[in-house]
Regions:
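Accessory alpha-helical/coil subdomains and C-terminal extensions
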Residues: 1-75
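C-terminal non-catalytic interaction/assembly regions of soluble proteins
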Residues: 43-194
């Protein structure tokens, strides 16, 4: 969990324990994982426009560490672009909310509202529902919203039931993107020069 300092010792203990028990282990790790001193586990030294570290390579770094220290067979997989190329795997909730955000953005832009981004706000109640809200860009640009500590287990290596209750509604439903000849069909927009 990137919200807490990463410990190589704890990582190796966890991986070793699960590997011995099951003969295999899958680790999901954030590119933002950092040591207690603030160094990223995999820092390339490259910075973005805001001066933040451009992250990447943590899977390979930790796979190599596990291979060296535990001696297990490893494979580091970085989702990077893959996750951006897999819209067909998006949940129906995610797809519906993307349409809500797009519609709200267009309607507000046509209405003359600029320098905002569209955000979501859950409504109270038993079933999951959310609405859209406009947020000033200055309030979100160059900021981050971290996972609350109460959503991370005591060991700092997994989430709590409270987090699962929050996240589960977000992955509900299967989207069925339109397909054509075995490939996703995308809108074809006319090229109109303004």
């Amino acid at each position: 969990m990137p919200e807490l300092p990463f410990s190589q010792e704890q990582f190796l203990t966890d991986v070793s324990r699960i590997y011995k028990k099951n003969g295999k282990v899958i680790v999901a790790v954030s590119e933002g994982a950092q040591y207690a001193d603030g160094r990223f586990v995999a820092d390339s030294g490259v910075r973005d426009a805001f001066g933040h570290a451009q992250l990447g390579g943590v899977a390979t770094t930790l796979a190599n560490l596990a291979k060296e220290k535990i001696g297990c067979k490893v494979r580091g997989i970085e989702f990077s672009l893959l996750q951006r190329c897999a819209a067909h795997c998006a949940s129906l909730t995610d797809v519906n909310e993307a349409y809500m955000a797009g519609e709200a953005a267009v309607l507000n832009a046509v209405d003359g509202k600029t320098d905002y981004c569209v955000g979501f706000e859950r409504t109270n109640g038993g079933d999951y529902h959310c609405g859209v809200k406009l947020i000033k860009l200055d309030d979100v640009a160059n900021t981050e919203k971290k996972l609350p500590r109460e959503w991370i287990n005591r060991e700092g290596n997994f989430v709590t039931q409270e987090y699962l209750d929050y996240a589960l509604p977000l992955i509900q439903g299967e989207s069925r993107p339109p397909m054509e000849n075995g490939l996703p069909r995308f809108a074809k927009l006319a090229k109109i020069k303004a």
